[in-house]
């Protein structure tokens, strides 16, 4: 069971002064039984059950239930490395930051289970504009709630939209914007495992369409507050286009060609912005050109890629 692996990673943290809130979102497997076992073994754990109301409600409920001033999220599929909370806590203390942003790793890679204080020399303090630009490109960190340390007060003021998929797209930029001091460190703290239920692997669901509304809210915010920052505008366009292409790929599987065609036409206007952006890889540019040029060839290449992905687990 993934939840056991997840909880073990939290209990093994080098920083022990934790309040551990589990929100069981209507699980139909043995999750409840497993959590009850952990509950008896560690007094720091608090367990709450909700009737399958979704990830956003679970996060919001966790924020409401906790009593600490700082919060880190972790999904049941994933794990924190043993030093993760200590690292984020130390970064916050060293910088007095209002948010701490670290990196997410992939389970296929190998990571050290211990760390020295060298990372404290690699902390960067970002302006809001730089922090948002880096978030949209997602190289060090992205919109995912994982591997971040948030003040509880900001999460209470900016709850996750309920009943949506890609709800973090509409929330993370607000949480970063709340911060007067933003600390970033390119150190992996969370490791993600892609199960069959992961958003990246699930089939199309109408709730995924919320991405387009959420990214539009980001665009409005950027254009309103930073209308002359062309590099930031290019970054949010990058996220809009490639996030949208991924969802359109899922829509193609359901033969929703009219909707896909709408976004193909819309994204064509970004041709120069995408092609002349040196932060976008050649592979991504080819993907973009295929998408706006031919649904047929885009679909063929996507199927080949997904086949290789499934073979590699």
What are these regions (language model features)?
Residues 50-66:
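Glycine-rich, basic loop-to-helix element that forms the pyrophosphate-binding segment
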Residues 189-195, 202-230, 241-274:
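Catalytic core of nucleotide-sugar-dependent glycosyltransferases
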Residues 252-313:
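Membrane-interface aromatic/basic loop that binds lipid-linked glycans or pyrophosphate carriers
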